[in-house]
Amino acid sequence: VIRENEAYDTKNIQADVWDAASEVLPPGLEEGSVDVVLMIFIFSALSPSQWKQVVHNIHRLLKPGGEVLFRDYGRGDLAQVRFKKGRYLEENFYIRGDGTRVYFFEKNELIKIWTGKDVERSDDTPSSTGFEVVNLGVDRRLLVNRAKQLKMYRCWMQGRFGKQEKPQPG
């Protein structure tokens, strides 16, 4: 879709499909060559068993000081509440009718995924992933469809994770 846009210019941007959970980096990109990784509703489609590899791959791609801009589903979102029992894969992880998967995150869970720190246990150890949380919040909204008289409670996680300048011991 991006490549078909008239504004797409290969001198300024490169768009490729990449399996972020594979061990191979995207075509044409070297380790430490990327300033920003944009992850919008990508992480939730991955199996929890793939998260560690994806975080590792993104760390490999980013320059020191580079950032991940993240937005995904939060726990308790309307989409989660609407899932029927037959769509449950594991806790907070579901399969849609079209076969795609979706996970619903909590703030502390994302901190642990991106930094390796367990917030619930007051973990003061340095990041084991090489990332720090720059900003992380929960975006809760009430959307109202007046025509259908529907109230829709939405919940998204939104954050910035920075690659630390110096490698952390571990």
Language-model region placement:
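A short acidic, Gly/Pro-enriched loop at the edge of an enzyme's catalytic core
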Residues: E23-V37
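C-terminal alpha-helical "lid/dimerization" subdomain adjacent to the S-adenosyl-L-methionine
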Residues: G74-N145
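A short glycine-rich, Lys/Arg-flanked "PGG" loop and its adjoining helix->strand segment in the class I
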Residues: W51-E67
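Hydrophobic adenine-recognition pocket in adenosine-nucleotide-binding enzymes
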Residues: I42
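Class I SAM-dependent methyltransferase SAM/SAH-binding core
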Residues: V1-P26
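Core SAM-dependent methyltransferase catalytic element
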Residues: D118-E120, G137, L142-G170
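A conserved beta-strand element that flanks and buttresses the S-adenosyl-L-methionine
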Residues: L38, L69
